[in-house]
Each structure stands twice: as C-alpha cells, then as structure tokens.
Amino acid sequence: MLRVGIIGFGPRGLSILERLVSKKLGQIINDKLEIYIFDPNSLGSGCHSPKQSSRLLVNTVASQMTIFADETICPNEFFIKGPNFYEFLLSKGYKADKNGYYSRVLLGKYLEHSFQCILKLCSQDISIHIVKEYAQCIIQQEKYFIISGENTKIEVDSAFITTGHNQNQNNFPMYSAYPLEISTQNISANDAIGIKGLGLSAIDVITMLTSGNGGFFEKLNNELIYNPSGKEPKIFVFSRSNLPLMARAITQKETREQYQAIFFNSTTIKKLKKEFKKLNFEKQILPLII
C-alpha cells in the first residue's frame, strides 16, 4: 500500500490529488493508494474561498484555468476528463467569455466542484481520509514520514506540502492582507493606510478600501472616473520600483492550446547539459528566460 499525505488543500493540493488519482486509475501506481488530507478549512478552494467578496477577480482568463490535465500535459497517459473553469461556468448557466476575468468566488466554487468530481471517481483501491486539523509537525524517518496534527499522528510514504504563502514572524506591526474581510473591516475615512508592494495583493486591498467602501467607477469620454463615497481612508502605496504591474495583454491562445517555447525549452537544456558538466543559472539559464 502507498500512503500519501497532502498538507494544505487549496488549488495546489487539489492538483496533487488529481495527479495521484489519475495515475492510480491509469495503473501507473499499482499499489493500493491511501491519501490523508490535512486542512481544517473548506477543501479545494483555498485562497479562492466562495465566502469572500465577489469584487475580487482572478488574474487569469477563464479558459486557461483547469484542475484536470489532458493529452497536452500527459501524452500517452490516462487522465481524468473534467471541465476547465470556462466550461464549468457555461454548465452553471453563466454567459461566460472564454477570455473573461471572473471572481475568485466563482473560481472557488469550481475548485470545490472539481474536488467532488475526483472523489466520485475513486475506486475501492483508493482511500481518501480528511483530517480537519492543521499539520503541526513533519518528522522524516529513514523510509517514511510522520505527520502530526493537533490530535492525529499518521505515517506516510510521501508527504506533499501545499500550504501556499506562510506568514513571517515580525517584531513590528505589519499585517497580512488576507483574509481581506478581516484586514479591512475596521478601517475608517480618518485612517491612513500604508501598503507595501504594488502587485495583486495591493490591488485587492485598494479595491476593498475604495469600491468596496461604496465608491464606484463611471465611464466618461472613454475614461474611467472614480467617484469616491467619502468612506475611503488615505492610502499610501510604495514598492521598490514604485511602479504598478504591467497590464495583462489580450490572450491570443485557444482553449487548452500550449505556448511553444523558442529559447528556453528541453532541446536547449539538453544541448547545454552536453556542453557543460554543471549548469550555472545566471550564465546559462537566465539569459534564455529574459
């Protein structure tokens, strides 16, 4: 029997489960499969919780997000057939655009739906155990790992840590942006807020403190004009460059189409490995990427 632990069960943990179940159903894994999932929260959605504000959007177009692999990812292998995010929206009656950007609430519902789809496919040779606890300790032995929860101790052959971004321990008052409903709820118009960074998390916080506070955008002469509600705090945003992220380009890919790399690909890496005994990231790899 193969015993596997998955610690944290958002989208990354769900992807691990999909791969394990696919390989078992495709007989790549021959042993009986026993999977232990450690997560006290809703399973599958992770940071895309259906309980958050519907104002918060996903940063990827609908047709390019899926939990289910296909022949472009796993050639000559068995794979579980399932919908991508765009196909899921259509099946639920939404008038979705394959290149549209939708809320994390909807993505969370898709992820939780995908988890249930995978569960229904599990045979008698696949056992999935849900441990509604935080994993507090992982001890590596010679041939196995011991995962200790608050009240549970499990021995597994392999352990996957898919906990997402963890918080650092700081000696000064700096707060995490998430969950946004908690981090922004007690902020008033009299407050001054500092936001370190100009990425996606900054956009989330600014959205909650502006349009989430009753402000709204109005289109006039092909320009978006923001109309404040008067409830917004003073917002100071800073980063190393003090420049916002570049906007996403309009996608030109079809659904499930893969970009074909020209410079940084497996053929180039094989040539470099023949030429150099050990690759230097800065000298051989980084120039191919940038």
Regions found by a protein language model. Name each.
Residues 6-7, 97-105, 149, 189, ...:
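Short, charged/polar micro-motifs that form catalytic or ligand-binding hotspots
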